[in-house]
């Protein structure tokens, strides 16, 4: 074996180590193109942790929940909520922050048929989210689409009707059922 071939392995290893050292000192790590950066594209720009009060309204009644150091409680008597209800509230709020509408219909698209066709006049239930005493978002939920995978939603103070993934409304419905004792 010639001297040239004997030095090939150690030279390649030294070059590889040199490249790693260069990457460490330059701070330029190649970004994987397989990973997608998280972007909150939901209808609520506020971070879920900022929401400290939730009001739920439905035909069966109205419920208010407050978040404190010990977790979610009923506003009326301060009783802590069961774990499943707490999870439903937390997940519902997160979904409002991260789940983008599948479709947004402007007023001229739905005005001729009216909101009743989408189950929004009156809405099936409403969730109002607060930061302190300030309402951040009021979401009125209507009927699911014919395939039952999407649901119509309207935000209070806006003219658009949103078509949201059904799991968003289902999580609010779990919280409503728990609040109503069912």
Name each region found by the language model.
Residues 1-182:
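A short-motif feature that recognizes glycine-rich, charge-decorated loops
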């Amino acid at each position: 074996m010639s001297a040239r071939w004997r030095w090939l392995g150690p030279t390649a290893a030294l070059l590889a180590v040199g490249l790693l050292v260069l990457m460490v000192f330059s701070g330029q790590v190649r970004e994987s193109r397989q990973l997608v950066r998280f972007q909150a594209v939901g209808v609520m720009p506020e971070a879920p942790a900022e929401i400290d009060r939730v009001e739920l309204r439905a035909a069966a009644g109205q419920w208010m929940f407050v978040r404190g150091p010990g977790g979610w409680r009923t506003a009326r008597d301060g009783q802590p909520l069961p774990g499943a209800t707490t999870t439903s509230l937390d997940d519902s709020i997160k979904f409002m922050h991260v789940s983008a509408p599948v479709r947004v219909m402007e007023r001229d698209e739905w005005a001729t048929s009216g909101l009743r066709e989408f189950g929004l006049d009156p809405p099936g239930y409403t969730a109002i989210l607060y930061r302190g005493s300030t309402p951040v978002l009021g979401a009125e939920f209507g009927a699911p689409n014919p395939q039952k995978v999407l649901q119509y939603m309207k935000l209070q103070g806006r003219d658009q009707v949103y078509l949201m993934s059904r799991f968003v409304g289902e999580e609010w419905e779990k919280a409503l059922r728990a609040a109503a004792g069912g």
